[in-house]
């Protein structure tokens, strides 16, 4: 066994952290970074620097390296790839030994992989494109409190996407008027109504008043329709203690589901709330407020597919994913990729959808994908095609903006959805025949007919800022 000796000084990162012959272990956490290096910094050195700074390295040699097995604990940059169509940056693949990270702590994973290294001067920009979590790590995480099948069984809703609605205006309503808006939408045919992400406990509507009036609305709508209903009560709060206080009250008044802003509220708070929901039989809806600050820049930040994986590990039964056809960012191929990462047990590498690694989730339950943001009845055929059954299609303005009111807007959406589900069962192509399908349904539904007339010219056709960088789309 060679004797280790200490030599003070500064060495190139590539001497220790660039290892092109390394074969990743099944237990390694793998990362794909998009690196834009500073001028004069070669690719291998920049990749090795990222591997070092995101694992156990620092800028100089230290004598305490002799007290550990650095070769075991270090991150290893093992492969570089060009980014198709962009010669200013490249992909670097880095492997991290599983023992670098606390079991079941996505907080700890992020502290290393997207911590100080993102301010490192050797790189001009840095983006975490994807992560592969080994099954050995997945098994240490709590995951969704309940998952898709448990939620369907509890609500007795099968064979179709579920319908939701974010109450508008998002701010300013009194608690009683807010509850009334919920009731009208639920009795009209929706499965859920929802707090907007920035509704917490403001002077115009304190959280306890909102919870009480909303649950009165939910229970009344259930009695009238004979269907299970719910409202996503946002328990996001200034402190964890206050968050749990709100969650406990939601449980006391019979709420089947609560809501959390997992990025703004924090991953630590989210994991704790997911555990509470699992223990108390409450479903957990997750909003992604703040994600675009992190993921929209194609050269710097964290891709949303990573945030999707982190949420599934941290815990949530629903996650907002964008719509493709609505007002929010997200191209179709990428969105289909992260929808699968939310729901499937195993997702293979697929560069055409931006997935860089195989991801095995084992027996971890999946999450409902939530489509929300600028959608209306004309989008229904595309939404059913893109998102499939295990999704929640949320029409805020597309419900409450109906000329005849909330109940009519909800009814229009329900008729449109059921028409699309029936047409799909008949083997029809929804996106090609969508207009005919909706027009036929509208002949028997004046609510749908008016909705189609109201929003027939409304489209959100903007090119995505963050596009897939693949050789053959």
Curated annotation (Swiss-Prot):
Its EC number is 4.1.1.39. The active site is at 168 (proton acceptor), 287 (proton acceptor). GO terms for biological process: reductive pentose-phosphate cycle. Substrate binds at residues 116, 166, 170, 288, 320, 372. InterPro entries: RuBisCO, RuBisCo_large_chain_AS, RuBisCO_lsu_C, RuBisCO_lsu_C_sf, RuBisCO_lsu_fd_N, RuBisCO_lsu_N_sf, RuBisCO_lsuI. It is an enzyme of class 4 (lyase). Keywords: Calvin cycle, Carbon dioxide fixation, Lyase, Magnesium, Metal-binding, Monooxygenase, Oxidoreductase, Plasmid. GO terms for molecular function: magnesium ion binding; monooxygenase activity; ribulose-bisphosphate carboxylase activity. Mg(2+) binds at residues 194, 196-197. The keyword Lyase applies. It catalyses: 2 (2R)-3-phosphoglycerate + 2 H(+) = D-ribulose 1,5-bisphosphate + CO2 + H2O; D-ribulose 1,5-bisphosphate + O2 = 2-phosphoglycolate + (2R)-3-phosphoglycerate + 2 H(+). Binds 1 Mg(2+) ion per subunit. The modification N6-carboxylysine is found at residue 194. Its cofactor is Mg(2+). The record marks 327 as: Transition state stabilizer. RuBisCO catalyzes two reactions: the carboxylation of D-ribulose 1,5-bisphosphate, the primary event in carbon dioxide fixation, as well as the oxidative fragmentation of the pentose substrate. Both reactions occur simultaneously and in competition at the same active site. The basic functional RuBisCO is composed of a large chain homodimer in a 'head-to-tail' conformation. In form I RuBisCO this homodimer is arranged in a barrel-like tetramer with the small subunits forming a tetrameric 'cap' on each end of the 'barrel'. Belongs to the RuBisCO large chain family. Type I subfamily. Heterohexadecamer of 8 large chains and 8 small chains. PANTHER family: RIBULOSE BISPHOSPHATE CARBOXYLASE, RIBULOSE BISPHOSPHATE CARBOXYLASE LARGE CHAIN. This is Ribulose bisphosphate carboxylase large chain 3. The lineage of its organism: Bacteria, Pseudomonadati, Pseudomonadota, Alphaproteobacteria, Hyphomicrobiales.
């Amino acid at each position: 066994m060679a004797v280790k000796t200490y030599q003070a000084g500064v060495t190139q990162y590539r001497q220790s952290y660039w290892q092109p012959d390394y074969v990743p272990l099944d237990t390694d956490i793998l990362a794909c970074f998009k690196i834009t290096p500073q001028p004069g910094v070669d690719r291998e050195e920049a990749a090795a620097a990222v591997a070092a700074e995101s694992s156990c390295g620092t800028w100089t040699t230290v004598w305490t390296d002799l007290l550990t097995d650095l070769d075991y604990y270090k991150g290893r940059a093992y492969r570089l790839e060009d980014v198709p169509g962009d010669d200013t940056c490249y992909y670097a693949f880095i492997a991290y030994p599983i023992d670098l990270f606390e079991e079941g702590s996505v907080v700890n994973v992020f502290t290393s992989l997207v911590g100080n290294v993102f301010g490192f001067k050797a790189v001009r920009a840095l983006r975490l494109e994807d992560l592969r979590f080994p099954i050995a790590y997945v098994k240490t995480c709590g995951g969704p409190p309940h998952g898709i099948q448990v939620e369907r069984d509890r609500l007795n809703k099968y064979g179709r996407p579920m319908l939701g609605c974010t109450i508008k205006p998002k701010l300013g309503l009194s608690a009683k008027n807010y509850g009334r808006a919920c009731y009208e939408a639920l009795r009209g045919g929706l499965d859920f109504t929802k707090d907007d992400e920035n509704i917490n406990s403001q002077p115009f509507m304190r959280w306890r008043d909102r919870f009480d009036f909303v649950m009165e609305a939910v229970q009344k709508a259930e009695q009238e329709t004979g269907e299970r209903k719910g409202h996503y009560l946002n328990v996001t709060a200034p402190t964890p203690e206050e968050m749990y206080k709100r969650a406990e009250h939601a449980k006391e008044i019979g709420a089947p589901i609560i809501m959390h802003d997992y990025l703004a509220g924090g991953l630590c708070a989210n994991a704790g709330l997911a555990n509470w929901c699992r223990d108390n039989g409450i479903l957990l809806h997750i909003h992604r407020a703040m994600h675009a600050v992190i993921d929209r820049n194609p050269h710097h930040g964290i891709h949303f597919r990573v945030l999707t994986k982190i949420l599934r590990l941290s815990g949530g039964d629903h996650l907002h994913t964008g719509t493709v056809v609505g007002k929010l960012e997200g191209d179709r191929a990428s969105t289909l990729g992260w929808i699968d990462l939310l729901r499937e047990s195993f997702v293979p590498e697929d560069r055409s959808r931006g997935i860089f690694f195989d991801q095995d989730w084992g027996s971890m339950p999946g999450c409902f994908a939530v489509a929300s943001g600028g959608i209306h009845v004309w989008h229904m055929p595309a939404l059913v095609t893109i998102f499939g059954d295990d999704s929640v299609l949320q029409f805020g303005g597309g419900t409450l903006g109906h000329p005849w009111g909330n109940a009519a807007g909800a009814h229009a959406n329900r008729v449109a959805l059921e028409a699309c589900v029936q047409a799909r069962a008949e083997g029809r192509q929804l996106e090609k025949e969508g207009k005919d399908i909706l027009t036929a349904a509208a002949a028997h539904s004046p609510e749908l007919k008016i909705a189609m007339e109201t929003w027939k010219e409304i489209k959100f056709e903007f090119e995505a800022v963050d596009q897939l960088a693949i050789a053959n789309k």
